[in-house]
Amino acid sequence: MRLEAIRYSPGSLQILDQLQLPEHCHYETLSSVQQAREAIRAMKVRGAPAIALVGCLSLAVELQAGAGGPGLAALVAFVRDQLSLLVAARPTAVNMARAARDLTHMAAREAELEGATEETVRERVIRFAEDMLEKDLKDNRSIGDLGARHLLEQTNPRGGKVTVLTHCNTGALATAGYGTALGVIRSLHEMGRLEHTFCTETRPYNQGARLTAFELVYEKIPATLITDSMAAAAMVHQGVSAVVVGADRVVANGDTANKIGTYQLAIVAKHHGIPFYVAAPSSSCDLRLETGKEIVIEERPSQELTDLNGVRIAAQGIRVWNPAFDVTPHELITGGIITELGVFAPEELRAALSATIFSEGQTLDSPQM
């Protein structure tokens, strides 16, 4: 049975509550944008692609239930305002903001068409959200296959197996299915070319220990869990061939925001001459921002560091700094940036994506909500 973070059918949306993993697999029903926003903020669902999918599908569920209106102007305003709430839930990842921009503009255009009705605009917005789910799964398979082939060509072209280190959770639980960085690992495993996987626990929220380890065991992929502080030693002593991570936002020069701890992995990988890859869909690329210095970094509550399962583990009165993400400079991404459109060196990203996406009449400009 396929592991699913999101279960959707017209009028119905459920998410796998990732706070309860790995002990319990509990699906929670979301019937409104407000419920989706709370789930995203609480990290019951996380991962840049999954956040955008859940956000837009929650809007689709509300629209299917008759929310919005009366009148075209009121309906378009409802779509815009609900999407703005979702964008504010977790600001670092670009996927939700871009989807909100595209949906808002599309709803406004549809409403201006001759003969437009509330029903036609609703149907168009709902269909857009549903199409996102199918596209994300297709893109993930492409990322996995393209990344696996490129990694093998760079590290072991003679047909041997490779060992990969990954960080945080970038698999089926963070996407519509299959995953980005973990999708590359899945593809290597399916090809019979994966020797072993090392996944970091990913403090303070332990997405690696709770989620990635869960996925790897579920899929019977050979893997070992390590603490974040063991990564350098693993690269030296465990034969790591490459490091593959995901991304919440990749900007024009290739600088990449990803889960806190990614930056230090890239530094250590470069020191040891190990290729460092970023795997992300083009929807995670933000070409309006020139460098990573422009990325807004979300800061999380102090209790995520000071408490564990409701039990205080840090001294009372200690100060806490808890950024959820860090930015890896493009020069440390030595393997390449893996997208559904190909694998690119950071300096190639802007031209490559602009040429491909613009030829299809789309845009990768950062959303302005």
From Swiss-Prot:
Entry's Gene Ontology cellular component terms: cytoplasm; nucleus
Marked site: Transition state stabilizer: C168
BP terms from Gene Ontology: L-methionine salvage from methylthioadenosine
Subcellular location as annotated: Cytoplasm; Nucleus
GO molecular function: identical protein binding; S-methyl-5-thioribose-1-phosphate isomerase activity
Keyword Cytoplasm among UniProt keywords: yes
Residues with Omega-N-methylarginine modification: R158
Active site, UniProt feature: D248 (proton donor)
Pathway: Amino-acid biosynthesis; L-methionine biosynthesis via salvage pathway; L-methionine from S-methyl-5-thio-alpha-D-ribose 1-phosphate: step 1/6
Entry annotated with the keyword tRNA processing: no
Record field: catalytic activity: 5-(methylsulfanyl)-alpha-D-ribose 1-phosphate = 5-(methylsulfanyl)-D-ribulose 1-phosphate
Function as written in the Swiss-Prot or TrEMBL entry: Catalyzes the interconversion of methylthioribose-1-phosphate (MTR-1-P) into methylthioribulose-1-phosphate (MTRu-1-P).
Family to which the UniProt record says this protein belongs: Belongs to the eIF-2B alpha/beta/delta subunits family. MtnA subfamily.
Name this protein carries in UniProt: Methylthioribose-1-phosphate isomerase
